[in-house]
């Protein structure tokens, strides 16, 4: 039972969200880290991400039951109770905001609450109504990175918006590759994902390339705002070009295997970016 509720918290996604907040915190701390604030920020971000993930499972349980990829999740499979899952999700989000407000700062707590609201009540319903849902979803998806920056600085600065831009841009090829891989499943669940609405893949491939290409200059913004140094700048450009190359390969051969390669590159991109920030920070 406990394992099923852990699955509801989407630990893989929650870990990436928390890592993005860590990236924002590093960019907001060019001269020194406040260990205590960092700890509470990571905990609050993880709790919020887990709560939002759980509530998302509750909202989409009927549609998950229609899809092969998600039919065996705890709620559609009957291994977890929807009412209990709803309570757990709300509790986790409230705990996150309740921790961040007094122990980090009010602005970061507000961003966490805004992330939950936008993800659950804007992005989630849009997934079934418009092909632009992925683009809209980049906003709540990138807010935790901005929250990491505000946790370190207490304000919305150029470095924070640079971090937000990186995460927002990165999400498009990441989620479009996933949507392409499971487009038949999404069609069964009646989701209006771009590869479902436009099955030829032209727009999907073009957007993946476009946003991956945009990510290369956007990723350098922390250097231009003096929130990161030259080591990060030198490393993040080839990292972005490699990611871009996988999308170009997908454009030439729109198969599930090539889409999976884009997805893998996107999953490795964020840890790679954080590693570069750490090396840059320590050196």
UniProtKB/Swiss-Prot annotation:
Localization, UniProt: Cell inner membrane
Membrane-spanning intervals of the chain: 13-33, 35-55, 90-110, 156-176, 208-228, 230-250, 262-282
GO CC annotation terms, alphabetical: plasma membrane
Family: Belongs to the UbiA prenyltransferase family. Protoheme IX farnesyltransferase subfamily.
Species in which this protein is naturally found: Salinibacter ruber (strain DSM 13855 / M31)
Protein name: Protoheme IX farnesyltransferase
Gene name of the encoded protein: ctaB
GO molecular function: protoheme IX farnesyltransferase activity
Pathway: Porphyrin-containing compound metabolism; heme O biosynthesis; heme O from protoheme: step 1/1
